[in-house]
Amino acid sequence: MLMLSLTATAQQKREFRGAWIQCVNGQFQGLTTQKMQETLIYQLDELKKDGVNAIIFQVRPECDALYPSNLEPWSRFLTGQQGRAPQPYWDPLQWMIDQCHARGMELHAWINPYRAKTKGTTTLSVNHVVVKHPERCFEYDGLTILNPGIAENCDYICEVARDIVTRYDVDGIHMDDYFYPYPVAGVPIPDEALYRQLGGNFSTIGDWRRNNVNVFIRQFYETVHQAKPWVKVGISPFGIYRNKRSSDIGSDTNGLQNYDDLYADVLLWVNNGWLDYCVPQIYWEIGNKAADYDTLIRWWAQYASGRPLYIGEDIERTVKAADPQQPQQHQQQAKHRLYEQLPAVKGTVLWYAKAVVDNPGNYAAMLRQLYWRMPALQPEMKFISKNAPSKPRKLKPVRVGSDYVLFWTAPKVKKWDEEATEYAVYRFNKGEKVNIDDASHLIAITRDTFLQLPYATGKQHYTYVVTSLNRLHSESKIAKKKVKL
C-alpha cells in the first residue's frame, strides 16, 4: 500500500514540519548532561530523516528555565530540583539551537506563560516568582497560576520573552494552550475580588478575563518583534474555538471551548495579527462524536487562515483509530488527504517528538518514505517583511580530491531581511526547463555556502540552481550553473 501511494502524493515546496519536544513528561529529569544530549541527538537525527524541519522545545514549563537565567530558576524537569544548575554545566537552549541549525531545522523556544507550579512540584527555589510575589498568583486544582488580571504579571512574562529573544538566536517563540486554567466542575477561579476591583468596564467576568489575555498577547507579540522582528510568535491553542451552540460561527462540536472556558479569543489574535502562526491542537480522530477531526480542520482552515495555519497532530491517537474509508488502516493517510484538500493548512506539528521516533503504526516511516521524503522550505511570512535577499554570487564547481563540490558566495547585505541565512539548491536534467516552483527539483536546504555533488562519469549534464533565503524564508532570484557529473 505504501509503494502504491508514492506517486499519488504531491510534495509541497513550502511546509512547516514541526515536532514538540516537551520536558514535563520527565523524559530528561535527572539525566546526566551526556545522557540527555545523547537522547536529544538521537531524536533529532531520526526526526531529520523523517523530514521534520522545525523543533518546538519546551524551555519554561513553570516559571523556570532550561537555560541560564537571571529572572527564573533552573527547572526541576532538567536537574530534579528547582534552582539546581546542571552538572556538568551546560545550556540546553543554546545547545539545541546549535544542534537544530546544524541539521537545517528551526528552533522555537516554547514557554508556558501563566503556569507557575505544576502538581508534582513540592519545593520552589527562593528566587521563584511564586516565592517572591505570592500576591500575584492564585491556586487552582493543584496548580499555581500567575493571575492574568494583574498587569505586573503581563510585564514579567514579556520580560522573560525579551530576555530569551535578545540572548538567543531562536527562530520562534511559542506558547501552548494554557492561559486561564482548564476548568474543574464546581471549582471557581478565585479572582472575583480582583474583578470587582479592576473589571468595572466589563459586563461579565468572562469578558474581563478574555481582555486580560488579549492585552497580554498583544504586548507579548510587540515585545518579541521590537527585540528581533524576524523571530516568529506562535501559539498552539486548544482545538475548539467555540461550539455551534455557543456561537453562529462555532464548529459543529461539543467540547471545551477556548473562548468560553479558557478565555482565549484565538480568532481575535489571528485577525489582529498578534501572532505569526497558529497551531490548533486537533488531537482527536476523524469521526470523534464530540470533536470530529474532519469538522475541526475544515473549521480552522475557514476561519483562522489570516496567519499561517499549522495543525497540531497527536500521532498516538491517530494510529489507534481506524480510517473510516479503509478500516484496515489507521488514520494517517486519511488526515493527510485532508491537508491536501485544504490549501489554508500550511503545515503540521507532531505531538510529540519521542512518539514520532518510536514509530507507532509506521507513522514515521510513512513520513520518511512518502509524505516528507523531499525537503521543504518554511512558509513565507511577507506580512513581517516583503524583502528578499539577493541571489548567491560566484557559483563555481570545483574538484576537491575525489569529490566534486559546488561553491558560492553569500550576497551582500544592508538590512536583516537581506541576509542569506540558508540556501535552497535545485537540480535539473539536461533539457529540462528551470522551474523552482516544482518541489521535486529541490534537493537540499543548507546553511553552508557549498554542496558536495554526486560525481559519476563526468558525462551527465545538469543545471544546478541556488537561491538565497532570509530569516523569514523569502527566496531570492536564481543563480545557476551547468555541471557535468
Predicted regions located by residue number:
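Beta-strand-rich modules
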Residues: Q452-S476
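Pro/Thr/Ser/Gly-rich low-complexity, intrinsically disordered linker/stalk tracts
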Residues: N362-E418, H473-L485
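Solvent-exposed loop/turn segments flanking beta-strands in beta-repeat/beta-sandwich domains
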Residues: P411-D438, H461, I478
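Active-site-adjacent "subsite" loops/lids of carbohydrate-active enzymes
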Residues: R14, W20-Q22, G26-Q34, E38, ...
